[in-house]
From Swiss-Prot:
Cofactor: Zn(2+)
HAMAP family (alphabetical): Ser_tRNA_synth_type2 (MF_01278)
Name under which the protein is recorded: Type-2 serine--tRNA ligase
Residues that bind L-serine: 313, 344, 361-363
EC number of the protein: 6.1.1.11
List of residues binding Zn(2+): 315, 363, 470
Subunit structure: Homodimer.
Pathway field: Aminoacyl-tRNA biosynthesis; selenocysteinyl-tRNA(Sec) biosynthesis; L-seryl-tRNA(Sec) from L-serine and tRNA(Sec): step 1/1
Catalytic activity: tRNA(Ser) + L-serine + ATP = L-seryl-tRNA(Ser) + AMP + diphosphate + H(+); tRNA(Sec) + L-serine + ATP = L-seryl-tRNA(Sec) + AMP + diphosphate + H(+)
Amino acid sequence: MRFKLDGRIIFSKDVEEETQKDIVEVLENRDIFLKGVPEGKENEASKIEGYEFDGKDLKLKMTSGTYTRAHEGIVRLKKPIMEKVGRKHQIGIRDVAIDRYVVTLTAEPSKVSELKGLKVPECEVELESEKINIVFENLGDGELKRNIIDRAIKFVKNELDKQDQDLTFEVCKIAPGTIVSDYKAKREITFDTDPTELAEPNGWVKRFPGRGQWFYTAPMAKLFRAFESLIIEECIDKIGFDECLFPKLIPLDVMYKMRYLEGLPEGMYYVCPPKREPEMFQDFVNEMMIKKEIPIEKLKTLLRDPAYVLAPAQCEPFYSFFDHELVDVDHPSKFFDKSGWTYRWEGGGAKGLDRVNEFLRGECVWMGTPEFVETVRDDTLKYAENLAEKLDLEYWTEVGDDPFYLEGRKKEDRGIEFPDVPKYEMRLWLPHIKEERKGVAVTSANIHGTHFIEGFGIKDYKERKVWTGCTGYGLTRWVIGFLAQYGYNYDDWPELIQKKVGKLPEIPKLITWP
């Protein structure tokens, strides 16, 4: 893909000559756009092809490939410009405006022609023989924050790939996105503030240096444990799952067998074991002590090749446990794990408390006959819905459009058996989002058919059909969904939560925080 942008950074007053000189220094520092760009891909990052000052406006012409795309690049300029000129010249940035933005995708002429007449909200689609131009005009900061550009690109790419239709749409007997159940709260929901905005001022969380990570202080931790206890009592124990302790450092071979490496390779944290050579690490330590900075390039030479990932799905060890084993479907297995964090690299998608790279879940995984697997999946979902209704939390359940295990099977020709509905997703309503009715996914209930059975060579000793399923109860998201509807006032919480939480602990007492 190629990106071509005509845009403006709009200041609070006319940009005088001395201010312009300082801003130009920032514009000439291309390192701003290279952060996070892989070595050898620098030409794919944003470039400023031209600029002009006009009163309050800094007019920019920018291009890019797929790394630090032009619309990300213009936003990335705001912070270093303000650090350079804000206090020094008493000037601020009012807005970022994109006057015209052309995103160009390439494809075979036959596929391009199939898009004739395609209408995409917020933009125009122009077709050439081997190109699709997605054209945006008059976008402001608000549209950028709402990710309109990324959504439009994804929409066009999905249309372009219809010949290679996502397997979800082929196997699913109910259209993905269909709402199959919902519940309206009996009380009036008056709290309508993003819980992330209040969490840190209230002292319940503190930002951690890592992207998409938070330090959860005692009050938030108490609420987490309350929900964990409720989910175990109200959902997991009622179905008879046995608790196990799953490893969280997963060998790449396991991920390969799951076909996760085909479906979502960019969504994982890869782990490189260090070389066991103390004298080489001493050089690393010495350089760090002298330079007072971490010598990353030297550290890279001391690491072995990636060998593991941090668990992105939490259920991975279950399938490895049964790798090439003979099982008896008359004695099905039902395990659950709540022993640690799950990790997914959301990249730029990480935001707030609901979209994080590190989160807690109660993960249920089971194996048995197709009938058994479907019954258990339905029960895991039913009890989650019952719990939400006990807490008077407004929710809906819909057919999922992204079962994680199908990402690696865009095309299928090996006779894998799939369920009629691979995934149900239960969402708690987020009342602070006004533009559209949105919810946070708190429970994901999946059936895999024979996907993992085939991948791990698992067989029934009488050669009967064996399926697997998994349900993730997202503790982090249950808590965020709860706070989004009830807020932080303990007295407003339902009695069931108050009893589980007991007395809320105090926040840390610091002079400078919260």
